[in-house]
UniProtKB/Swiss-Prot annotation:
Homodimer. Heterodimer with a RXR molecule. Binds DNA preferentially as a RAR/RXR heterodimer. Forms a complex with PUS1 and the SRA1 RNA in the nucleus. A zinc finger (NR C4-type) spans 90-110, 126-150. Belongs to the nuclear hormone receptor family. NR1 subfamily. The modification Omega-N-methylarginine is found at residue 34. Residues 185-419 form the NR LBD domain. Residues 1-89 are annotated as: Modulating. This is Retinoic acid receptor gamma.
Length: 454
């Protein structure tokens, strides 16, 4: 079992060697080793070493020794390296050529211009008489005449197409979906995690959106009406996250103490991930599970405060990943079941439980995007970003506690729990006014608390 000091060190950063098995998922790929040409390794002082001047009486002896010894040979000077290959100037613009491309000697600029023009079926227009002079100074002034010059000097359309098809074939062979087949066990795991996520978090298209005009146009320190609504929805979201955790294979097999430790550590991470997947960039809004849709200003006024822009920026960074529900569920599970959290009783057991989740996400993401091999590590890097946001969120809770008129809602309080942070609230254990009987954790022993998710 790792010591507290070791866990504290591990919790500082997410990456190989902490929560993830480093050997299984390397993110750094060493470059190919290159040997130095043998003659470049020799000191210049040893190249072409001649015989030193000798006295006349020794010269004949030296010559005789050299001629009669069959074992001693004077090394000849190394032949000079061949001169670098010189190509004719670019046939299109007369600039320095980098080689033969698409059938003619051409520079990198004209090679790239011709390739892009053919691959994208570009149609250009000449604003003069279609006889512009093309050289290295004027080549960017008229794309029409430059392309015509490419054809005139012999550049081949077919060579571009063949090159493109060859690259596509290589990518297809390297990343064929058949090479990322999932075992029956991983297929079953993915199905269970995906179902757990979908049944505890409806997708954006399933929600009936509605909006409010409350403080929609200007930022204020805190809109109490929006805060009450947000805290109510956040409480329900935490309950759903606990339910999600209980449905993950193996989670309830952990000790009760470790289940609570993992939930408290990751709950805010998963909450942020979930709300950010409901970001609509066209309107710059986020939608909650009941359909309430708030713009950036309203999110600020609902309690996010200075955290708002950081959360919206993260939501924007998720968009290029185009994660589906299965990937979001797997990433949430990996975020939750992580052995580098502090105060775990059995971190090794947690790590063992996380390994198949990592493998499932890796293979699923690669099978879904055969030509994008780096999507899996990019997803994992988002967990690091989420932890940074959660740290800022805990800091925001300190100032928010002084802005709201009553106590922090119980589940939110426990999610961010730091004994010193909420010491003044210890005498107010009652539920938040907006909390209902539904706010009790399923299977819990205490109302509104993360007492026992098992």
């Amino acid at each position: 079992m790792a010591t507290n000091k070791e866990r504290l060190f591990a919790a500082g950063a997410l990456g190989p060697g902490s929560g993830y098995p480093g050997a299984g998922f390397p993110f750094a790929f060493p470059g190919a080793l290159r040997g130095s040409p043998p003659f470049e390794m020799l000191s210049p002082s040893f190249r072409g070493l001649g015989q030193p001047d000798l006295p006349k009486e020794m010269a004949s002896l030296s010559v005789e020794t050299q001629s009669t010894s069959s074992e001693e040979m004077v090394p000849s000077s190394p032949s000079p390296p061949p001169p670098p290959r010189v190509y004719k100037p670019c046939f299109v613009c007369n600039d320095k050529s980098s080689g033969y491309h698409y059938g003619v000697s051409s520079c990198e600029g004209c090679k790239g211009f011709f390739r892009r023009s053919i691959q994208k079926n570009m149609v250009y227009t000449c604003h003069r008489d279609k006889n512009c002079i093309i050289n290295k100074v004027t080549r960017n002034r008229c794309q029409y005449c430059r392309l015509q010059k490419c054809f005139e000097v012999g550049m081949s359309k077919e060579a571009v197409r063949n090159d493109r098809n060859k690259k596509k074939k290589e990518v297809k062979e390297e990343g064929s979906p058949d090479s990322y087949e999932l075992s029956p066990q991983l297929e079953e795991l993915i199905t269970k995690v995906s179902k757990a996520h979908q049944e505890t978090f409806p997708s954006l298209c399933q929600l009936g959106k509605y909006t409010t005009n409350s403080s929609a146009d200007h930022r204020v320190q805190l809109d109490l009406g929006l805060w009450d609504k947000f805290s109510e929805l956040a409480t329900k979201c935490i309950i759903k996250i606990v339910e999600f955790a209980k449905r993950l294979p193996g989670f309830t097999g952990l000790s009760i103490a470790d289940q609570i430790t993992l939930l408290k550590a990751a709950c805010l991470d998963i909450l942020m991930l979930r709300i950010c997947t409901r970001y609509t960039p066209e309107q710059d809004t986020m939608t909650f599970s009941d359909g309430l849709t708030l713009n950036r200003t309203q999110m600020h006024n609902a309690g996010f405060g200075p955290l708002t822009d950081l959360v919206f920026a993260f939501a924007g960074q998720l968009l290029p990943l185009e994660m589906d529900d299965t990937e979001t569920g797997l990433l949430s599970a990996i975020c939750l079941i992580c052995g580098d959290r502090m105060d775990l009783e059995e971190p090794e057991k947690v790590d063992k439980l996380q390994e198949p989740l990592l493998e499932a996400l890796r293979l699923y993401a690669r099978r879904r995007r055969p030509s994008q091999p780096y999507m899996f590590p990019r997803m994992l890097m988002k967990i690091t970003d989420l932890r940074g946001i959660s740290t800022k969120g805990a800091e925001r809770a300190i100032t928010l506690k002084m802005e709201i008129p009553g106590p922090m809602p119980p589940l939110i309080r426990e999610m961010l729990e730091n004994p010193e942070m909420f010491e003044d609230d210890s005498s107010q254990p009652g539920p938040h006014p907006n909390a209902s009987s539904e706010d009790e954790v399923p299977g819990g022993q205490g109302k509104g608390g993360l007492k026992s998710p098992a």
